[in-house]
């Protein structure tokens, strides 16, 4: 017997027996109480990754969603990736996540951003066919072993007494649906997106919705508040959609995809569509007439008047006009699909009344006769302070309850997917009582994302950038598999044999290729004769290796094969291998210094803080009340994480360090 909380009261109940369930269920199809290892609430980008990851780890998983037909829906922009975001996608893929593979099957315009800089900060990006992406994602989800999908709205959580030895006031044991039925679970993951008390806004009109056409989640938001979670409010928005045939593309700047197109997934040798068959994007700009319409009608825009914070790095046109007056702002015209008649004007997120949106659109070059098919709108929603979760994404207050995605204050499909895959892995590991799978700041962009959230929190929608990452040269998009796949295979069991073998082949091929390149040595004068374009000094006395020559911008693997076909030709048979050898050569000299810095940081991260430590009451360590409260809120797991919390002083860190060492010594005795 255990305590449960259902629909606002406490009662006693016993666990229902496990039953095999069909892959897809209706809301009322449960003849008796079902029981799963992991229940995931929400079928967006965090939810799909979480559910699939938990199932890959061997857990019987249920994905609950308001509507099965919206699983994998791209609610805002028709694109994935970008600067920083492309890194996250590569890391999700290295953990055997879904979104990268699905993008390689659904893209209509692939391009690498930031190419003027080094490959460590390149941003893989693609325009995606909305319809195709959703179809491919649903096909993947509905065919995943151990994963069941059910339509249903969750209104409450089933709670029990906490497990001894773990932080938390209670333990989640299941969910209560809107029809009053209960589903029991060992772990629960909330990936509710913008649905917690979601409100859509156009002009002065407001109505409850988590997304256009979908009802918000009210009961669950109230439950979380009653449990003591700190709840905040954020906002976001989306642009109007335009009719393709009504736009004059002939006078606009045309942008074509890359040739060849680089896929997102390490399992993909190429994307599904040839560069010549991909669709172009077009660029236009706002003008002073757009500014005038915005400024003259602020009184008709309640979304702008609200003090709720929106995304800093994806602002509405109203925010841009107010913050940067008298400037022209880019508007990218992006296709929504191969057979779609809609164009997404990226950069034109707006919440003015619909008639003013139409007036504003027709002021823009190329859009003078554009037809608005759907108006833009704003969304306001609840989020939970992410300092209330651990790096495994399990909450401090309720054991075995995990949060992932926009509920943690992030923005973007990629940030949501990254959290989803980590939450899914750890929810499954929690069921089997195994240690959590945590990615540190020194191991990946995912680690930086989660560490920022759990130690610093956020008061505005958080977006990933390369500038947030200390060890960018080591945490590149090209090496995410060698950084994460082997760990995930060993510690979490979430990686398929196909991916593991592919990563193993790539790792051994890189090591072999680098060794061969180092072994080929000639004088600088001979290299100059072989490859005249390299800017090498012929006065160098020491022999120069092929790896050193490959560092020059003018040289790639194909150049070397042209003069040394016998030992090197096999390394260009795989385009990705040849590209990675070039990148490894480019960064070889600086990586040794960064690896030493990483080791120093890892020493701090290795000093674990006891998870049962009560910062508010412990007297064995000297801490101010302010520091105690900050540590109690964030509950850092290591000395390194504690040092990154704003307001935690160096003196407090020293005292914590002494406490940890003395505790460790006493336990050893």
UniProtKB/Swiss-Prot annotation:
Gene that encodes the chain: Mto1
Residue numbers binding FAD: 42-47, 154, 217, 406
Tissue and organ expression note: Ubiquitously expressed in various tissues, but with markedly elevated expression in tissues of high metabolic rates.
Residue span of the annotated presequence: 1-25
InterPro entries (UniProt xref): FAD/NAD-bd_sf, GIDA_C_N, MnmG, MnmG-rel, MnmG-rel_CS, MnmG_C, MnmG_C_subdom, MnmG_C_subdom_sf
NCBIfam families in the cross-refs: mnmG_gidA (TIGR00136)
Name of the featured protein: 5-taurinomethyluridine-[tRNA] synthase subunit MTO1, mitochondrial
PROSITE patterns per record: GIDA_1 (PS01280), GIDA_2 (PS01281)
Organism from which the protein derives: Mus musculus
Cofactor list: FAD
Function: Component of the GTPBP3-MTO1 complex that catalyzes the 5-taurinomethyluridine (taum(5)U) modification at the 34th wobble position (U34) of mitochondrial tRNAs (mt-tRNAs), which plays a role in mt-tRNA decoding and mitochondrial translation. Taum(5)U formation on mammalian mt-tRNA requires the presence of both GTPBP3-mediated GTPase activity and MTO1 catalytic activity.
Principal subcellular localization: mitochondrion
Subcellular location as annotated: Mitochondrion
Family listed: Belongs to the MnmG family.
Keywords: FAD, Flavoprotein, Methylation, Mitochondrion, Transit peptide, tRNA processing
Modified residues (N6-methyllysine): 507
Ranges that cross the membrane: none
A Pfam family hit: SAM_GIDA_C
Reactions that this protein is recorded to catalyse: 5,10-methylenetetrahydrofolate + uridine(34) in tRNA + taurine + GTP + A + H2O = 5-taurinomethyluridine(34) in tRNA + 7,8-dihydrofolate + GDP + AH2 + phosphate + H(+)
Assembly with partners or alone: Homodimer; forms a dimer in the presence of potassium. Interacts with GTPBP3; forms the GTPBP3-MTO1 complex composed of homodimers of GTPBP3 and MTO1.
Gene Ontology CC terms: mitochondrion
GO molecular function: flavin adenine dinucleotide binding; tRNA 5-taurinomethyluridine synthase activity
GO biological process: mitochondrial tRNA wobble uridine modification; tRNA wobble uridine modification
């Amino acid at each position: 017997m255990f305590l449960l909380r259902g629909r606002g009261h406490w009662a006693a109940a016993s666990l229902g027996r496990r039953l095999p369930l069909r892959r897809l269920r209706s809301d009322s199809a449960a003849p008796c109480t079902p029981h799963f290892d992991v229940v995931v609430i929400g079928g967006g980008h965090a939810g799909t990754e979480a559910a699939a990851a938990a199932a890959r780890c061997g857990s019987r998983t249920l994905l609950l969603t308001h509507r099965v037909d919206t699983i994998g829906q791209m609610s805002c922009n028709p694109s994935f990736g970008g600067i920083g975001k492309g890194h996250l996608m590569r890391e999700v893929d290295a953990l055997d996540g879904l979104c990268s593979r699905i993008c390689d099957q659904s893209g209509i315009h692939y391009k690498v951003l930031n190419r003027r800089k080094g490959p460590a900060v390149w941003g893989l990006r693609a325009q995606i066919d909305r319809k195709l992406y959703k179809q491919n994602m649903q096909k993947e989800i509905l065919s995943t072993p151990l994963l069941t999908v059910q339509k249903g709205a969750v209104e409450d959580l089933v709670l029990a007494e906490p497990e001894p030895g773990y932080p938390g006031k209670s333990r989640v044991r299941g969910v209560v649906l809107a029809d009053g039925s209960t589903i029991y679970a060992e772990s629960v993951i909330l990936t509710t997106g913008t649905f917690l008390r979601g409100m859509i806004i156009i002009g002065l009109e407001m109505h409850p919705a988590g997304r256009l056409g979908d009802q918000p989640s009210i009961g669950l938001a109230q439950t979380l508040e009653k449990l003591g979670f700190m709840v905040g409010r954020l906002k976001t928005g989306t642009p109007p959609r335009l009719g393709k045939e009504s736009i004059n593309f002939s006078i606009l700047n045309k942008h074509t995809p890359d040739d060849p197109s680089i896929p997102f997934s390490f399992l993909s040798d190429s994307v599904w569509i040839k560069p010549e068959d991909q669709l172009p994007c077009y660029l236009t700009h706002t003008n002073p007439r757009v500014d005038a319409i915005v400024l003259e009608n602020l009184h008709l825009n309640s979304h702008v008047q609200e003090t709720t914070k929106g995304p800093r790095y994806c602002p509405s046109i109203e925010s841009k006009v107010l913050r940067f007056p008298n400037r022209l702002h880019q508007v990218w015209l992006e296709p929504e699909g191969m057979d779609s008649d809609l164009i997404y004007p990226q950069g034109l997120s707006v919440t003015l009344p619909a008639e003013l949106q139409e007036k504003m659109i027709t002021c823009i070059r190329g859009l003078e006769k554009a037809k608005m098919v759907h108006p833009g709108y704003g969304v306001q929603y609840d989020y939970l302070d992410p300092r209330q979760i651990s790096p495994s994404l399990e909450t401090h207050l309720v054991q075995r309850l995990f949060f992932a995605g926009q509920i943690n204050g992030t923005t973007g499909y990629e940030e949501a997917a990254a959290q989803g895959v980590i939450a899914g892995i750890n929810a499954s590991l929690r069921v089997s009582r195994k240690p959590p799978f945590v990615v540190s700041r020194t191991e990946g962009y995912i680690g930086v994302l989660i560490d920022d959230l759990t130690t610093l929190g956020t008061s505005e929608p958080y977006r990933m950038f390369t500038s947030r990452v200390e060890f960018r040269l080591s945490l590149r998009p090209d090496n995410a598999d060698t950084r994460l796949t082997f760990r995930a295979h060993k510690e979490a069991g979430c990686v398929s044999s196909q991916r593991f073998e592919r990563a193993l082949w790539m790792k051994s091929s890189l090591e072999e290729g680098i060794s061969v390149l180092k072994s080929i040595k000639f004088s600088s004068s001979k290299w100059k004769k072989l490859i005249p374009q390299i800017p090498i000094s012929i006065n160098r006395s020491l022999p120069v290796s092929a790896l050193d020559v490959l560092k020059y911008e003018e040289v790639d693997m194909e150049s070397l094969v042209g003069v040394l076909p016998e030992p090197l030709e096999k390394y260009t048979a795989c385009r990705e291998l040849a590209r990675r050898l070039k990148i490894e050569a480019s960064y070889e000299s600086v990586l040794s210094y960064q690896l030493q810095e990483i080791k120093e940081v890892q020493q701090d991260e290795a000093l674990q803080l006891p998870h049962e430590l009560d910062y508010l009451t412990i007297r064995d360590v000297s801490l101010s009340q302010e520091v105690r409260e900050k540590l109690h809120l964030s509950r850092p797991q290591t000395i390194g994480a504690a040092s990154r919390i704003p307001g935690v002083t160096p003196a407090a860190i020293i005292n914590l360090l002494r406490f940890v060492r003395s505790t460790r010594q006493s336990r050893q005795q």
